[in-house]
Amino acid sequence: MTARTHHVPLRIAVSSGALSPQVAALLSRQRAEEPQTPVVLEEVSVCEQVCGLEDGRYDLGLALTTAPGHSLNAQPLWHDELALAVPIRSPLLNFTAVPLEEFAHYPLIRWRSDEYDPVDQLMERMQQQACTPPEIFCVRTFELMAILVAAGYGIGLGAKSRIAAARELDIIMRPLAGDRQELTTYILRPPCELPPSVDRLAERAQAISG
């Protein structure tokens, strides 16, 4: 395939579950090391992300999926884990890691995104152990989940690093007891030759620990 025309600025598509402190670190590093190449970040669904990468609207993507069945190249970048968001006065704070049977007594606010498979896996595990929460609410954004948790409507599920970084929203992170529910952020690249500036951005992403 022919090389893609250089885009200024670089356009990065991020599906909602993949937003994390590492993304902020990547943007900061890009500005410090290559300020002449700005980056535009766009939050999209996985479907929009895949289509946009394949048709040339985006240069790179960050997602919690490898986009199987498509022509994109996926490489693992950062690793996180599923954790609980609890209110600042929750009895669950007595646990350093919360067992399933304990948080199953509370309404669960799950951050619903089309690529958040680890949440579905955890829900299946809870059903197998007969400890399904009394109520399950689905929301589309992390911010709404955090607001509802802080207001006492239930407890939330999300990425450990993002919950821990949102302490100012009056929510506190607690890990889940038992087997770790891993979340992996992948960098998605279109199947064509990319300009060197895109390759450099991808290298910076790979250099950030997570």
Feature names for model-found ranges:
Residues 9-13, 61, 85, 109, ...:
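Short, well-ordered beta-strand segments
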Residues 21-23, 107-129, 195-198, 202:
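Secondary-structure junction motif
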Residues 2-51, 158, 194-199:
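N-terminal winged-helix
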